[in-house]
Regions:
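MPN/JAMM (Mov34/JAB) isopeptidase/deubiquitinase module and associated MPN-bearing subunits/adaptors
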Residues: 1-80, 84-180
Length: 180
């Protein structure tokens, strides 16, 4: 399974995760899906998410209301959700799903996890082993991983974001040139 992130979705995930760092964000993913590809067009943050440092709980009734609103007003579908993991004390954030993440994972949907940590040196955006997208923004290290649940089994999906790899790399080249 491949999970494509559009420019809007990629920026949405970054802004949403960085805004609340070191707390954790939660939101829904809008887009469309085919049997082996999911296209994420938008990442929409939930303002009502009761953000704690370790876990994010949301009001599930409200979530259903949002899904119905999306279905009746846009051509996109709710294809899954996302949340961030933040560095906690000395423990660095990872993109691994917690037990609670697994419990709340709905069948047939995609779950994106954005891990945010402090970092000293900027790092170009690239794909790392297992299909994770990794890079940095303004002193924060970001890793974006995706999972997909089918037949009651949660598997890792490959994150694909031409925008992140191409455009961000060019930006960093320009930046490097301008400081030399
Ligand atoms: Zn989690």
């Amino acid at each position: 399974m491949e999970v494509y992130l559009s420019e809007n979705a990629f920026i949405g995930l970054l802004v949403s995760a960085l805004e609340v760092y070191r707390r954790e964000c939660f939101g829904i993913l809008l887009g469309h899906s085919t049997p082996d590809r999911v296209f994420v067009e938008f990442a929409v943050p939930y303002q009502s998410a009761n953000r704690k440092y370790r876990e994010v709980h949301i009001d599930w009734k409200r979530s259903q209301r949002v899904e119905e609103a999306v279905r009746s007003t846009t051509r996109w579908e709710c294809i899954g959700d996302y949340h961030s993991h933040s560095k906690f004390g000395l423990r660095r954030a990872t993109t691994q799903l917690s037990n609670e993440d697994k419990q709340h994972f709905s069948e047939g949907t995609v779950g994106v996890v954005v891990a945010v940590n402090d970092i000293r040196k900027p790092r170009p955006w690239s794909y790392v082993k297992g299909g994770t997208l990794s890079g940095s923004v303004n002193g924060y290290s970001i890793r974006i991983a995706a999972y997909y649940k089918s037949n009651d089994h949660i598997a890792r999906a490959h994150v694909v974001s031409p925008y992140a790899i191409g455009f961000m790399e060019k930006r960093q080249d320009l930046f490097r040139r301008s400081i030399q």
